[in-house]
Amino acid sequence: MIHPTAIVHPSARIDSTANIGPYVVIDEHVELGPGCQVGPHAYLTGHTTIGANNVIHAGAVIGNVPQDLKYRGAPSRLRIGQGNVFREQVTVHCANDLEEDTVIGDGSLFMANVHIAHNVHIGNNVILANGVLLAGHVTLQDRVFLSGHCLVHQFVRIGKLAMMQGGSKVSKDVPPFTIVRDTNIICGLNVIGMRRHGYDSAARLELRKVYHELFRSKKKLDAALATARDLYHGEGAQLMIDFVASTKRGVCADVGKGSVDDESQALE
């Protein structure tokens, strides 16, 4: 159903099961999949493809041009998967050129006033709380959780099941399974998240050992990575080791204060 006050370009591809609310504007090159709901005053624009069962709340702007001085008007793209929720005033921008799309996977929640800039890649089942700001070219792997008003610098990668505490900021990569506080500081492992998503006690203990080798052993990173590769071979361990080894920006540091990593939790 399309509300009579909505303005939908005749060339936009809107599935017949989508529900378009009052005063929505949908531009020419938008494709909106089955079961989507678009709330009042939302604006869908750009070369934007939105999959099934997404919910877009009031005032969200999806697919606008990037805030990048290098952008020269190319018909760059935004691709959104299925089952995501975009709350009030969320903004998501298309890529800044034709070489790469802005991409959002499936099943994520973006709370009010989140900003997702050009060329960002977001995996599945991600949660961004109110006011999170992602700069251009950021990558979030699956099941990342960023608390309210976190700031992520351009080109930063945040690994699987990582978390950021409210108001924290990063300009370096965040390894999988870790928790960020303050600015570029990690303070242990997301043990509860690992447990909830199938990492048994043996896997959690191995990850704790990898974490200590990489971030608390006082070794140079290359030496710590070599030791970790020799000793630890589980799926989670390899994910963390490979992520850290591939960094181009450096990774956040553990400075040994305010740790939330607890041995008893890791062994449960």
Each predicted region: which residue ranges?
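Terminal amphipathic alpha-helical/low-complexity segments used for targeting or macromolecular assembly
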Residues: 1-5, 10-11, 16, 53, ...
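Structural signal for interior beta-strand "rungs" in well-ordered beta-sheet cores
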Residues: 2-181, 185
